[in-house]
Amino acid sequence: MKILLVQIKDFENSLENEIKAFFESKNFEIKCKSFELSDAAKIPEVLLQDSVSIDYMIGVGLAGFFVLSETNSNSKIVVNPWMSPSQKLSQKETVSHDLITILKKIETQTYDWVDAEMRVATYGIFTHDANSCDKEMFLKNYGRNMNGVDNYFIEEEILTNVLEKSLEYFAHIRKQGDWQSLNLFYT
């Protein structure tokens, strides 16, 4: 199985290395793709092109948002995804108004395009310290297919357990053979 681990330069997360190690231990083929935030407008299209040759797409934090923006219904695992990066980044002086405008456009397109198949194909993992607005927005757009972790920081053993659950979830979905028949996973 092939995995694409998406990263945004200067927004990397320590969990990315642990996630990579987990999937390497399962003999998954892992490709890491790193983007500059200044290239935000191009990221969804590049990910869409890359999606044809992978089984799972994974992103943490800001990278999780861009994983959600990819419109193909690949299996997606997002950890503490930033659901509205335009709001989070609008307070930073180093982020231009033009970039905020681009992010708002991607947000609108991302959440307007969510359909039943995309809901089932998306699995979210949230830690206790994740922004509650992000959790609520994930639930609103993608349904109940998420796993909450009560810890502020995900220890390796806990991360391993929730990643195992995500793989079990997707194995169950694939076994069903019909993504759209699994409406029980969302509200």
Locations of regions flagged by a protein language model:
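Residue in the alpha/beta-hydrolase core beta-strand immediately N-terminal to the catalytic nucleophile
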Residues: 55-58, 75-77
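Short hydrophobic segments within beta-strands
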Residues: 4-8, 58, 125-127
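Gly/Ala-rich beta-loop-alpha elbow adjacent to hydrolase catalytic centers
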Residues: 58-68
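Conserved hydrolase catalytic core segment
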Residues: 69-75
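A short, charged/proline- and glycine-enriched loop
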Residues: 1-2, 119
